[in-house]
Amino acid sequence: MQGARDGRRRALRAAVLAPVAGVLTGLILVVALLPAQARDAPARLHLVTLSTPGTSGSDRSAEELLSMQDAVLSEAGVAAPAYRWTTALNGFAAELTPVQVEALRAADSVSLVEPNEVHELSSTPADLGARTARVPERARGGAGIVVGIVDSGIAPDNPLFADVPGLGREPERFSGACMPGDDWAADSCHRKLVGVSWFVSGFGAERLRAAESLSARDVIGHGTQVASVVAGNAEVSVSAGPSAAGRFSGVAPQARVAAYKACWAAPDPADDGCASADLVTAIDRATSDGVDVLSISVAGGRAFDTVQRALLGAAEADIVVVGAAGNRAGRSYAAHASPWVTTVGALAGPVPQGRVAVRGSALSLVGASRSTVATGSAPIVLAGRSRTAGSALAQARQCREGSLDASLVAGAIVVCQRGGIGRIDKSNAVRRAGGIGMVLTNVRGSARIADVHSVPTVHLGARDGARLVRHLRRHSATKARIAPVQQRGAGARTARWSSPGDPDGAVVKPDVLAAGTGVLGAVPPVTGRRWNAFSGTSAAAAHVSGLAALLRARHRDWSAPTVRSALTTTSAAVRDGTSTLRQGSGRVRRAAALRPGLVLRVASGDYRRWLSGTLPSRSLNTPSIMARDSTVVTREVTNVGTRSMYYSSTASGFDHHRVRVEPAALRLRPGQSATFRVVVAGSDTPRGDSGTVTWRGAQGTTVRIPVVISR
């Protein structure tokens, strides 16, 4: 027995040292070839991925992987690394000189070396695109599922993340812990917030904003907003002062949350971001902890960088990985261009509305409003005519704190001018002075924002605001009423800023679209409020992450690729004239995704074979197709329904190519699989094209597979 163990150790040592010898040789050559200036350059943090699998798809133990890393570090003369990865990735982050970087890149034992970079979060301030308000009303779903949120942390004191009754069954495989930190004890986690971790070595603790917390506590607000949309508790009251905006539930309110803080606040908010070394470490930890869904709303770098390779390791561990496409349309293509990530673009919708009706006149103006309660008839006053003694007229018009005379404002609706201070700060000033409502008017422009205000509020564009002000200047003793407006038939469209897929990419991106403008979410107390609207593909990705949790809870035997297929193939096309590379499969549909009929499954190891080039794209069983002019693409579908079903196929939407499906029809028993081919016949001249292959079941089930044909 001892001899067998010794033999295994000798074999392991030989396996480790054989490729490492190349590192030492490479170091000697690089030192000789690099110019003196480069040899003397300071060390920088780099991410190093070793060539051996070292992922959750490998049977190598963590001990073996660490031994390999030790040998590479030693031979390259690298000091103690900042991070080491053994679950989603086999690699490390370390300070490297240019000499060490080039030597490692030349070594057979190393597959990738890249510098640590800071990525931005994929959201925008609400006023850049807040056009819809969504307060989900579902009270159940996601029981037993843990969603890992890689982001800026979480606000644990918010009632959306409280340990409440009714969370349902306990998670089966999660083993994460509660990492202590500033103002965060090791016992701060519970049945809802099941684990937290934080990683700052890549970003640098010395670069943090003074208000930042060396813990999982969120000060930016982004991570809290995302987590609240994904899995916030059910039926939590949304309010700011006496003004109610209804009740809030996350998409999967019974799901548990694990927060992995890898995004940090800098002194200048423009420098906020997420270092790639911290991101990879967070992904590695989440994979080791055993989350069921992983949500990452970070703008991507290169197509298959270290972050994407770590996400591959997560996918190989049967984790549904959901990523934000990014908000840089016209400047860059969609992030997370990997087939193992469900990449989400954003939908824009109508602004939620309210009406201010002036009594005794025909003046009735509609603007942005999130208020769900009416004020009743009340005096309406101009803020500039209601100022305190000593306050400047400009300050009073903007409803700055202390500028409003309570004797003139109490019980009234106050007309405030936009600018100078925050919009919500204005309604707070009105409330403190005794006002019961606010009309916010633009100085210029028509952009209107539906914020969560402390009094019922309607936000008017400049033209309507000027009409109201002119009327009140002529009629001083006037009453008005604020009330919500019911909207009907307003359709969503692809957000203009949502990043499109690369027409020359390997896979179709984004995969799906979801609501991404003016999405209501919780924010940490440090921001000065409890609720705020946010916009961006991060909001959309949060929605899809919640849907993934619902599917995993409902269908506990479904693999991650099955969930990914169900989300994409049941989506509905958005009829707004945008291309497949803007919307992928289209708008996600919750009810349809729960009953997809047919799914496309990816076999274990196929993603990695595809990445290595040994499996062609036409054979990777993804729920979308990126074709090259004339070609034949093979896909396999499986019936996950409870009865035998007949399906017929169509190929539609193609302008320049002839596309057919063979066979044209399938009959499948429950659990049965079948292969079909998509045959693309080229056009006379090379031209891009797109369309859809659709399978329709006898009971109305629709399975849509988007197809993009590149030139």
Go through each PLM region and give its residues.
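Inhibitory N-terminal propeptides of secreted protease zymogens
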Residues: 36-122, 409-410, 436, 640-641
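Secreted peptidase-domain scaffold signal
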Residues: 277, 281, 287, 326, ...
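Extracellular/luminal Protease-associated
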Residues: 145, 274-276, 294-298, 375-462
